[in-house]
A protein has these predicted regions:
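N-terminal accessory segment at the very beginning of proteins
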Residues: 5, 18-144
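Sec-dependent N-terminal signal peptides
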Residues: 4-13
Length: 144
């Protein structure tokens, strides 16, 4: 009987891990776009930007391949920004512009300077968008 109990407990724990999910995405709508932020783990976050009035991306990310976890976050809001914090990473979204900033322990990791969308009108990608994001970098800081 003990073996059946422990086997059942193990199976339930396994199922709970398989079905864990991230918190609901945080969305900020500006005059030109919708910015959606989803934490997949305390140190991994997925950001999706969609032109305002267009259908959002429903495809699975090719970059963030981790299955979403149940991440404990703190959300706060003031007049200019929404802030979402995990135990490792802080994400700030400017409510007016939709620009995103990533911080760790209060120090800037990466900050968007601007973004834009170019609609694809022909070929297999017709109807999708090419997104351009410009980041604020230090003078000698490269991105790989």
């Amino acid at each position: 009987m003990k073996k059946i109990f422990f086997l059942s407990l193990f199976l339930m724990a396994s199922l709970a891990v398989m079905h864990s999910k991230a918190i609901d995405p945080v969305e900020v709508q500006t005059s030109t776009a919708v910015t959606e932020v989803t934490f997949y783990s305390p140190e991994i976050v997925r950001v999706v930007k969609t032109p305002l009035g267009k259908k959002g991306n429903t495809r699975k990310s090719l970059v963030v391949t981790l299955e979403p976890q149940d991440v404990k976050v703190q959300k706060s809001e003031n007049a200019s920004a929404i802030t979402i914090k995990s135990t490792v990473l802080t994400v700030k979204i400017d409510k007016k512009t939709g620009l995103v900033q990533f911080l760790s322990k209060g120090k800037n990791l990466l900050k968007e300077k601007s973004y834009g969308f170019e609609e694809r009108t022909s070929g297999p990608d017709a109807g999708s968008f090419r997104t351009t994001i410009v980041y604020q970098l230090d003078k000698d800081e490269p991105i790989y």
